[in-house]
């Protein structure tokens, strides 16, 4: 869902204050708290991705540097380091590659393989796949609709 139907190759972090409260209620419990990051993508990425997923603290800039890219939107220094090793690239090359059409596909294939998602796909465990990719089930109804449409299109 974050890739906007595979049309976006980088995570869109331009959120209003109200939307920040919905997406990250623990980090932004009210609109007053969210105002500082509203419509400031770099500041937001550095705040919400700080000190997790292998990223440094907020001042390191890692949140922005390692924001979601690719068709599955790999996120965080640790994921990019693993992707770089798999692609035999430097970390900087892997980050740049994930934002290209070819790299967006490469990163999705790598993520799918690294996280062993074929087994879940074979059993149509869409919620479990979603949790592996995004940590929750945001967009589940739309994802289920799109999967049904894809199955219909191939006559399955």
Label for each model-derived stretch:
Residues 1-97, 101-156:
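Cell-wall polysaccharide-cleaving catalytic domain and substrate-binding groove, primarily
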